Amino acid sequence: MENPRNTPRLETPRLILRRFVPEDAPALWELLRDREVNRFLPWFPVETLAEAEKFLRERFLDTYRTETGWRYAVCLREEPERPVGYVNIAPGEAHDLGYGLEKVCWHRGLMTEAARAVVEQVRRDGGLPFLTATHDVLNPRSGGVMQNIGMTCRYTYRERVEPKKEWVAFRFYQLNLTEPEDYVWKGYWESHPIHWIEDTGV
């Protein structure tokens, strides 16, 4: 049974953020099969609707049974029944913020608007000391979203990403909610021996 405190509906000036439902599988498939959208994400584009349905079930639908969570379908207000993206906080000690958005919606500030709304909901719900996010150094626009919602870059590390089997340098961003401002979660720093601190200016 789904928990009503998990992923409560949110509205912003241009967006509706809601839970995914099984009927969203075709729209999610369109997003997950786009090679450009998924270029910097840690999975290959999905090939079939069945794969998208499995992704939807495992990463979204099944998670709504837990006590709290923030795993949203991002919809335009004028078309609330069709997701154009997703934004979520992953379970685990990193409290990692992740997101994806279809290409026709890029460069309009929509993901910043969605991510900011989720961060504010996390603050209202309480319980998380900080949020983190990472982006491939070759994808600085994703880092722009992180900066726009108040995150700052704390360090960079190199990781071999599965299943793509590629070495990637990631910038690690953090936003402290209840921790002191200078607190840095070092989980990725400690688990990846190739790491450094960049002068990124943010």
Task: Spell out what each predicted region is.
Residues 20, 48-50, 63, 165:
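A short hydrophobic/aromatic micro-motif that marks alpha-helical segments and, especially, helix-coil
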Residues 36-58:
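Conserved GNAT-fold acetyl-CoA-binding loop/helix
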Residues 32, 41, 63-65:
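Hydrophobic residues in alpha-helical segments
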